[in-house]
């Protein structure tokens, strides 16, 4: 019998499921009856392609496509709403090819397909896929997104179980897991760390360390047969709370018999039993004599030393993995021992922090700093950090903000530049060929040009910086750089600067005919009248261009719009924006970069890098400021132009650009 409320809920859920329609598509296993005209020694049997040439094994894009759309026999086989369609060009090309039937190899192909399906029906594969499928469904029902370290923890669990329970098929199942987690391009040596027998996570407070363990434990004992999972907490009430949460979720999700007895939750099947044991460090011998496949140690930094010896003993078991999860190091040595594993030959330490190691020094020397200056690290939306929180935390306990909230370690680091070495090397080495016709189809058709004029002949002071920047999806491409010095302070100074800018724009448009719009910002802080004259000079030199030429307009003292831009407090935000994009490898240079003023024997990008490396921090009592300091070898004019061009390279203030 069902009560009226339960009956109505079941009815509504059933109706909703009937209405739900998901567009799905997977590759067919129907035998492609097509003759392959090549020597038999070069033939391979591919489950999706049939009998094909062996060279297809070395096409990574083809392999990735087949793995993505392969029919694995479960709900994770496809990505939702991805319908396969043939382009008109492909259909036309295929219609011109004549195919000859080849029924002789049907048996050979069907044998390969049956072997693949047998692999998908194998218990270990269905256990791993079932675990991931249940976890995905549960996360969707919670309407939450996983933190990166939580995904990392799940990968450590599932990859180790696959490696120990299915060593012969580990590679294939691992490729399946990589596709689900969208980590196909990660280095293999990095992925091998998931197979290590132990790993350590040091995570800041309030990041869901214990929360993610509940579904992991539940769906492990639900999907994997004869598995034993251990959970050890630093306090008994924590262990009991997690056990209750796991029991509730098990009784809701698992159709088998669920038994909770003596701090052990068991899932009883017809021919197997899976269990999860929950213990605290106050009972130091509670986990001795057990045989765990996965042992989760929560708040490991605060585990009693006597209990830790019993935990470490499981390292000798070949099929056991120990995962230490804890808050980050505090000021006392007794609760920071996990940082010692950084010295181990294997990479088992994972430190999750708001501050990267390259800039940790600034949080000890500069008390006002609260965020990492490279802007690369992820911070959840439910975490709030500001200077008031830092002062309040440190008022309660000295250095508590760094040690308890930020997730920093006690290790001291030397000062390093704000921009990382990897981002500098990538900007220098990886440059796009923007004259490539295939790439030009994806490049934005608007060129943003920033002009920072300087009216001086002193080369040690400053010159005019000019930069041309465009978009490529979420990336920025530098098309041109100029660093122009006046020969004399004559009446034609504005004409000389305007001519330099026009020549750069003309050169960019000449080799990049896809540009249809040029938007120019001329800084008018030095002289508004001179900026207006520069704008009209640029217009005169580009009068024959087919591109639409627009200038950033600002109201003057009389209320008239004039083609100049007044730089106020934008510079600090622009530098922060540049540092963030640069360290995220989102700023690239064109191989065909235009520059008429930088010496021919000097690479314009290397010239720019000399200035980029001079970006530094200035910390005041109120905030953290950035500056591009000048040196005797290089001025910062070209860099300022690039920074401002990238900052304004968007469509947010389109109405302020007008033709003159």
From Swiss-Prot:
Keywords: DNA-binding, Host nucleus, Hydrolase, Viral genome packaging, Viral release from host cell
EC main group: hydrolase
Keyword Membrane recorded: no
Motif range (Walker B motif): 294-299
GO molecular function: DNA binding; hydrolase activity
Record motif Walker A motif, residues: 203-210
Catalytic machinery residues: 299 (for atpase activity), 452 (for nuclease activity), 523 (for nuclease activity), 637 (for nuclease activity)
Subcellular location as annotated: Host nucleus
GO cellular component: host cell nucleus
Pfam family, one: DNA_pack_N
Similarity remark: Belongs to the herpesviridae TRM3 protein family.
Stated role: Component of the molecular motor that translocates viral genomic DNA in empty capsid during DNA packaging. Forms a tripartite terminase complex together with TRM1 and TRM2 in the host cytoplasm. Once the complex reaches the host nucleus, it interacts with the capsid portal vertex. This portal forms a ring in which genomic DNA is translocated into the capsid. TRM3 carries an RNase H-like nuclease activity that plays an important role for the cleavage of concatemeric viral DNA into unit length genomes.
HAMAP family: HSV_TRM3
Subunit comment: Interacts with the terminase subunits TRM1 and TRM2. Interacts with portal protein.
Designated name of the protein: Tripartite terminase subunit 3
Organism in which the protein naturally occurs: Elephantid herpesvirus 1 (isolate Asian elephant/Berlin/Kiba/1998)
Lineage: Viruses, Duplodnaviria, Heunggongvirae, Peploviricota, Herviviricetes
Name of the encoding gene: TRM3
